[in-house]
């Protein structure tokens, strides 16, 4: 039910109105004067204005977290060292060294040429990209010298392809030297790139032509490489890997798996620090290595391996450490500051000066510094024991322990030693005296000295035994108490995880079990000034009868808002334990007669009698059940338990040989253009529909033939469609279709002409007039009548045959005349060359 429902509002108003007004006013005035708390009925609902105490936990929301931010667990089977009275405990300084995961970082220079071959095609309207090819070509040793000394590079590139040398020229021009320019610089990632070409060469072919363009870009990259112990290979920040030690010189025993013929070391090598035109500053290297790989070349400075980071680095140092040798012949190093115990086998002592000289020198310097700063006034070095103890812990850490002694104990031991020597000398001199005078000459001093020696020796032995026993007992009890406390916390956390984890972290958290681990979430603090608590715990009726007893809320109802919400926003919930706000209002119970409830809110306790607000008392007025057994001791310091982090986030970040962030930044910055890749042609077999496929399978061999035929037809159609989709194929198809249409039109017109006048079509020279020379041959007497009309009106087969032969000869002669006339005409080239001139008519003189 919502808190703004009318039924609930009427119930609240009824609760306010049914009280005696005078009694209610007296109660309010008394509470205001005595308890300094404001209780009022605002508008329609009764609420209590709560004053928060900053020293206690704030109002917050811990329940209902959908997802935890962290997961934790309690340790199991914690092993404590087995201390015994025979264990030898020694006080001293403890240094703990962890393995250094930060790799050896050194600068490198990468050389290569980027060859880009582009194919372009153009038609009338647009240009077409037919694909391109990009190759990385390593720079040879001779050209490297030109780059490092003069800051220039050749514009040509030579590479091997198919067993033959191939030459490529930038812009398809002659080979020449070009200067470098700054192409890209990333100071954070340590990448600086120099290029000779910032853009591709223009590639615009003519209409209906295909063009190939070449761009050769000389690229030099100054970046960093990383190598981790045992330094068998190193990785470059741009993603390349060199399978060889950075300390390999060609004649030492370092690992090198690259091609030896492509590797060379230069002594006293000088090169430019920057490859820009304005840079002239050079640097000389004692040794620099050059390696040519398949698609790039690389150079780096070769140093000695002792200049690399030490394999182990100091992690923790303690001036109050205890070394104890157990009955199992193992050493346990307990540190008060670290609240931890490290175990090591006593037979695995390290020889630091030989195996780890860098650790030995650093430990020596650290011991001297810590002793002079922290222990010089109270302790002295223990000269009776070894200089230092160095062992490898069970977790792979190097433990170096230096024994020290308290000055008071040393002074006591010196007094004992002095008294013992005095007693021995006096005894020696007395032996030379006579026996008669021995008893009389033994004075009180000798007896006093013997007594002092005995007393001092006894006191020292007793004190030493007591101190050693106390130290061992405290160390053992400390470990066992932590183990038991850990087990108790684990059991309590199963009952109430949030309360247990809040007590451990000393701040309110929300916790719940997720299987065998505990999810922990930070509580959300609400606006502290907006929290209001209602004065009644009775659930308003909704028109239905509850029975003999009404329903009442088991926890008070509250309203609140979050910090980022406006004052008009009202959220509802119920007040939980320790100022926790529980979401929802479903926590109810059957109302009890003569009930009284105390609820802590802030620095006050609100009392509800018969489920209505009665009065408020101060939280400090209620006595606390004292469960502590107080120890009357002074100068007792608390120990703060902290998580021991072996490696920091900075060390873990630096330990990665290949940095993905730097790689992606370099990739996205430099390779901004997307290269088109040639798509592989995959022939897909024809698959008929399911029903048709079943029918064809029933035809066995015949069905297979039909399926193959359909597949071939599909392949043919797909090939034709692919050809038409290509710009060249589509253009050629349009031209062929146009030629076919023009040819059909010409043929159609000629067929119509042949049908209309076949004689004129087949014999176009019939209508031509005879030449004059033909007429002159018939001048003379006309023929007779009989000769002119012929002897008959019909023609024989022989006449027809002669006529056809004559027509054939006539047609042949006409064609030869046309050919001769065509040959006599000038060609197109002659017409263009002799344009503006006219042909003179020939005359016979």
UniProtKB/Swiss-Prot annotation:
Involved in fusion and/or binding to host membrane: region residues: 120-126, 204-212
SUPFAM superfamilies membership: Viral glycoprotein ectodomain-like (SSF161008)
Residue span of region Hydrophobic membrane proximal region: 677-725
Pfam entry (one): Glycoprot_B_PH1
InterPro entries found in the cross-reference section: Glycoprot_B_PH1 (IPR035377), Glycoprot_B_PH2 (IPR035381), Glycoprot_B_PH2_sf (IPR038631), Glycoprotein_B_ecto_C (IPR055341), Herpes_Glycoprot_B (IPR000234)
Record's bilayer topology term: Single-pass type I membrane protein
Subunit structure of this chain's protein: Homotrimer; disulfide-linked. Binds to heparan sulfate proteoglycans. Interacts with gH/gL heterodimer.
Job of this protein: Envelope glycoprotein that forms spikes at the surface of virion envelope. Essential for the initial attachment to heparan sulfate moieties of the host cell surface proteoglycans. Involved in fusion of viral and cellular membranes leading to virus entry into the host cell. Following initial binding to its host receptors, membrane fusion is mediated by the fusion machinery composed at least of gB and the heterodimer gH/gL. May be involved in the fusion between the virion envelope and the outer nuclear membrane during virion egress.
Protein name: Envelope glycoprotein B
Species assigned in the record: Elephantid herpesvirus 1 (isolate Asian elephant/Berlin/Kiba/1998) (EIHV-1)
């Amino acid at each position: 039910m919502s808190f703004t429902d009318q039924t609930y509002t009427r119930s609240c108003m009824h609760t306010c109105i049914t009280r005696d007004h005078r009694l209610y006013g007296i109660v309010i005035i008394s509470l205001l004067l005595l308890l300094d708390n404001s209780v009022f009925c605002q508008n329609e609902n009764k609420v209590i204005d709560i004053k928060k105490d900053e020293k206690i936990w704030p109002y917050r929301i811990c329940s209902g977290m959908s997802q935890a931010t962290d997961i934790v667990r309690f340790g199991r089977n914690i092993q404590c060292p087995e201390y015994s009275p025979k264990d030898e405990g020694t006080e001293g300084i403890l240094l703990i060294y962890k393995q250094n995961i930060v790799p050896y970082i050194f600068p490198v220079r990468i050389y290569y040429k980027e060859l880009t071959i582009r194919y372009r095609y153009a038609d009338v309207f647009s240009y077409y990209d037919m694909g391109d090819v990009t190759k990385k070509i390593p720079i040879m040793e001779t050209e490297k010298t030109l780059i490092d000394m003069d800051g220039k590079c050749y514009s040509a590139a030579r590479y091997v392809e198919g067993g033959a040398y191939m030459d490529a020229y930038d812009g398809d021009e002659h080979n020449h030297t070009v200067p470098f320019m700054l192409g890209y610089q990333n100071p954070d990632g340590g990448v600086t790139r120099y290029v000779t070409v910032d853009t591709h060469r223009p590639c615009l072919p003519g209409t209906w032509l295909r063009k190939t363009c070449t761009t050769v870009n000389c690229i030099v990259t100054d970046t960093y490489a990383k190598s981790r112990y045992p330094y068998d290979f190193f990785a470059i920040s741009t993603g390349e890997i060199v399978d060889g030690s950075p300390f390999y010189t060609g004649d030492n025993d370092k690992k090198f798996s690259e091609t030896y013929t492509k590797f060379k070391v230069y002594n006293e090598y000088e090169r430019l620090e920057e490859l820009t035109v304005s840079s002239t500053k050079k640097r000389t290297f004692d040794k620099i290595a050059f390696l040519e790989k398949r698609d790039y070349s690389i150079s780096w400075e070769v140093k000695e391996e002792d200049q690399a980071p030490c394999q182990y680095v100091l992690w923790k140092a303690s001036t109050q450490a205890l070394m104890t040798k157990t009955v199992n012949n193992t050493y346990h190093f307990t540190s008060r500051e670290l609240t931890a115990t490290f175990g090591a086998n006593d037979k695995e002592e390290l020889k630091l000066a030989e195996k780890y000289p860098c650790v030995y020198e650093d430990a020596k310097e650290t011991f001297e510094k810590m002793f002079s700063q922290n222990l010089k006034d109270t302790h002295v070095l223990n000269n009776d024991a070894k200089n230092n103890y160095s062992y490898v812990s069970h977790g792979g850490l190097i433990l170096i322990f230096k024994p020290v002694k308290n000055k008071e104990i040393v002074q006591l031991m010196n007094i004992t030693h002095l008294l013992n020597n005095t007693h021995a000398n006096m005894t020696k001199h007395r032996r030379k005296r006579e026996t008669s005078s021995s008893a009389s000459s033994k004075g009180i001093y000798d007896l006093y000295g013997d007594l002092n020696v005995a007393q001092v020796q006894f006191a020292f032995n007793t004190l030493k035994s007591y101190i050693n026993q106390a130290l061992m007992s405290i160390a053992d009890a400390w470990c066992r108490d932590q183990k038991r406390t850990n087990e108790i916390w684990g059991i309590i956390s199963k009952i109430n995880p949030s309360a247990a984890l809040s007590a451990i972290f000393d701040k309110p958290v929300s916790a719940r079990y997720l299987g065998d681990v505990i999810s922990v979430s930070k509580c959300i603090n609400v606006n502290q000034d907006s929290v209001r608590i209602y004065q009644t715990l009775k659930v308003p009726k909704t028109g239905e009868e509850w029975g003999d007893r009404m329903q009442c809320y088991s926890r008070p109802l509250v309203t609140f808002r979050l910090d980022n919400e406006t004052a008009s926003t009202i959220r509802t919930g119920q007040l939980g334990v320790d100022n926790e706000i529980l979401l929802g209002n479903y926590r109810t119970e059957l109302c009890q007669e003569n009930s009284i409830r105390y609820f802590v809110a802030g620095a006050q306790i609100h009392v509800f009698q018969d489920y209505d607000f009665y009065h408020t008392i101060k939280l400090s007025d209620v006595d606390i059940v004292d469960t502590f057994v107080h120890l009357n001791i002074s100068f007792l310091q608390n120990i703060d338990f902290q998580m021991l982090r072996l490696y920091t986030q900075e060390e873990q970040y630096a330990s990665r040989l290949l940095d993905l962030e730097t790689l992606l930044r370099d990739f996205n910055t430099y390779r901004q253009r997307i290269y088109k890749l040639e798509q592989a042609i995959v022939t897909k077999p024809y698959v008929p529909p399911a029903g048709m496929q079943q029918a064809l399978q029933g035809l066995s061999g015949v069905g297979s033939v039909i399926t193959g035929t359909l597949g071939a037809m599909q392949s043919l159609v797909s090939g034709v469609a692919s050809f038409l989709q290509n710009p060249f194929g589509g253009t050629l198809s349009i031209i062929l279709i146009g030629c076919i249409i023009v040819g059909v039109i010409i043929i159609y017109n000629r067929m119509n002409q042949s049908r209309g006048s076949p004689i004129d079509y087949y014999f176009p020279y019939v209508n031509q007039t005879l030449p004059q020379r033909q007429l002159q041959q018939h001048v003379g007497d006309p023929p007779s009548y009989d000769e002119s009309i012929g002897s008959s009106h019909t023609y024989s087969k022989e006449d027809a045959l002669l006529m056809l032969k004559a027509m054939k000869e006539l047609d042949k002669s006409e064609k030869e005349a046309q050919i001769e006339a065509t040959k006599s005409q000038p060609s197109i080239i002659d017409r263009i060359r002799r344009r503006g001139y006219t042909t003179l008519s020939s005359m016979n003189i």
